[in-house]
Amino acid sequence: MSELTTTHEWNNLPWRKLERKVFKLQKRIYQASSRGDTETVRNLQRLLINSWSAKCIAVRRVTQDNQGKKTAGVDGVKSLSPEARLKLAKQLRITGKSKPTLRVWIPKPGKDEKRPLGIPTIHDRALQALVKIALEPEWEAKFEPNSYGFRPGRSTHDAIEAVFKGVKSKEKFILDADIAKCFDKINHYVLLKKLNTFPSLSRQIKAWLKSGVMDGKELFPTQEGTPQGGVISPLLANVALHGLETLITNKFKRLSTGQNKRTAAILVRYADDFVVIHEHLSVIEQSKQLISQWLSNLGLELKESKTKIVSSKTGFDFLGFNIKQYSVSDNHSSRNTKGEILGFKTLIKPSDESIKRVYEQLRDTIDRYGTSPQVALIKKLNPIIKGWANYYSTVCSTDTYNDLDSLLYNKLQQWARRRHSKKTNGWVAIKYWHVNEGKWDFRAEEDEKRISLLKFYKTKINRHIKVQGSRSPFDGDWIYWSSRMGRSPEISKKVAKLLKEQQGKCGHCGNYFDTDSVMEIHHVDGNHKNNKTENLQL
């Protein structure tokens, strides 16, 4: 078979049909798991793992859709041709074997230290994606409602809304917890026992966990932990930590009668980051002890130096946001469910650390582009501004946006003056800035087209609507899930508008977009300069 033929064959696979087949089985697994029918779950998982449809989708996800697709493991393979993708899909099967992962060190955001990733080979990544396709719907039916990290259809914004609902009506105490080296320390035996899957799959997962890691030319054994960098690792970590919320909510239930009236304790978790919320300090202190005991069974422990108990009046940071109750006048105060004035207002804002980090990123970019054309600098800064502003567009960010715009303006003035040290400030201003709607616009021209620097303050604030309870995309309610995708703060306005116009469906295959979909904007007439809405399609 020639390479041209196999390229054509891979690119022209009936992807719409394959995705529908896979989702139908996933939906059945989710339903069987929801009703506790383990035998049906296992039979359907075997069927899915051996299906050609799932194998093709698994290969596509790790070789085409995944952002880290061009990272090599110990095999040295960074990318695959369509011919090789087809070959890999045909080879995928559960063998109970695994090659070591490759240790790659990446910087921690905003810190000088680095954290290790364990990158599997491209074959192991594809096989892990296949296993995840089968395991995820089973566990989505089991996972607790206030678990939000690395789950389809859930985000940091859902977690923050859950925290807001927990603290908005009364002063609360918060256990702000940090698990020490969570991914690196999880006990393999306890994890595999908790997974409780069929023997051949259990052996395969054990092989991945025990595969070892190559650091340089030296192989290190892995007796504990799940390697960060594996496709299946976040799911395994969620399985390991499943039950933590139930532990707290069962122990500290709502009491509506008697002398010891109290509300229920709330635990909100995003992967290994979590907070416990309650009105009584004693409940929070007991929660900490209870959680420490529970974690010890997994081989984990709380990091004392980073675990603290705080009040909602003093505020706390969680997932890059700051949550705090501010004392305000009666006119601006929140009210409880009885309509009584509380004397405070709970506000969520970007955390100081996150503000500092984005400004440093902008500042360093400007410094690096000291002698570059203005257009090049604008093109480099705009994605940073847009991404950060969109992420924080669901909370009280207006003041922060204005502050960042002011800091950025001052930094750009320094940049411009350094380039023309012998010119007057007025000359520099006219060269690089233009007045637009009464405000200075940092703007340049390229191919007779104006390119302006984005402004933080122009980002519209829209409150995020939290995902409902324990809902999952595997429940098959396409209308609900596609409408949520269109409201996500992490997608651009243009994509959101097209999603709404296309009613959540792909313009090419007609399938509904799901949470794993990579959405790309296509120009209908092939003219990439024609960006009119009617010429764009997702």
Language model feature labels by segment:
Residues 8-68, 133-149:
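Charged boundary/loop elements
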Residues 61, 89-113, 122, 126-135, ...:
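Reverse-transcriptase-like RNA-dependent polymerase core
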Residues 142-146, 150-154, 158-315:
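Conserved polymerase palm-domain catalytic core
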Residues 210, 216, 298-373, 384:
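A conserved non-catalytic segment of reverse transcriptases
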Residues 405-494:
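Extended C-terminal regions of large enzymes
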Residues 491-519:
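Short cysteine-rich loop/turn motifs with clustered Cys
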Residues 511-538:
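Histidine-centered nuclease catalytic patch
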